[in-house]
């Protein structure tokens, strides 16, 4: 087990996977993926389950007020439903757009990689660029369209697997020189996976 250059905080909402025929519609979660990353790469993981906007705000406030403790966690993985330039929490009325999410984070996203494991959150390029600039993120990644849970989990795993040993994460934005972008080109095109 090698030591990764990055560590992850995952904030995951409840998933009601409507396409699932099983009795347990709330059976999806990212914890197995995160455990695999921890075991394979030796990275540290903080996993928090959020049920509603208040939970999300609680954890963002906690992380922001304890920045020194969480300095080494430079990847923020937000796993939930999404809509055009917004995230959506199961059972909550309304969405949280990127601007509101940045306000809720209270500076915690600065100099971090923010990955959205959610449908359509990166659908509006102008909003994504504004979010990245306003929050000071190193990199913002995710999907422009509605994505299948299993296929997007594969893309998320590939992304985290590749990024673990890169200090210069800017290379992921360059389609011409990024081995990651070339290796998974067809998957990225299918899912409209974006890196900014």
Regions found by a protein language model. Give the residues of each.
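A domain-level signal for caspase-like cysteine endopeptidase catalytic cores
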Residues: 1-73, 110-117
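A glycine-rich, hydrophobic loop/mini-helix early in the fold
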Residues: 63-99
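Caspase-like cysteine protease fold
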Residues: 94-105, 166-196
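Catalytic cores of nucleophile-dependent amide-cleaving enzymes
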Residues: 91-153
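Short, small-residue alpha-helix embedded
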Residues: 153-164
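Short acidic, S/G/P-rich loop/turn micro-motifs used as interaction or catalytic elements
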Residues: 15-22, 53-55, 82-86, 120-123, ...
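Hydrophobic, Leu/Ile/Phe/Ala-enriched alpha-helical segments that form helix-helix packing faces
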Residues: 32-41, 60-68, 105, 132, ...
């Amino acid at each position: 087990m090698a030591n990764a250059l990055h560590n992850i905080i995952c904030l995951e909402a409840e998933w009601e996977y409507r396409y699932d025929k099983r009795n347990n519609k709330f059976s999806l979660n990212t914890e197995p993926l995160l455990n695999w990353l921890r075991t394979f790469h030796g990275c540290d993981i903080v996993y928090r389950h959020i049920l509603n906007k208040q939970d999300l705000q609680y954890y963002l406030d906690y992380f922001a007020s304890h920045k020194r403790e969480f300095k080494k966690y430079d990847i923020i993985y937000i796993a939930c439903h999404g809509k055009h330039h917004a995230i959506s929490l199961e059972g909550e009325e309304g969405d949280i757009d990127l601007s509101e999410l940045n306000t809720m984070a209270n500076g915690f996203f600065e100099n971090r990689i923010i990955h959205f494991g959610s449908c359509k959150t990166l659908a509006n390029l102008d909003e994504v660029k504004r979010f990245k600039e306003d929050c000071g993120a190193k990199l913002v990644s995710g999907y422009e369209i509605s994505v299948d849970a299993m296929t997007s989990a594969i893309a998320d795993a590939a992304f985290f697997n590749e990024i673990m040993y890169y200090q210069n994460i800017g290379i992921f934005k360059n389609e011409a020189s990024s081995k990651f972008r070339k290796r998974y080109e067809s998957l990225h095109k299918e899912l409209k996976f974006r890196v900014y």
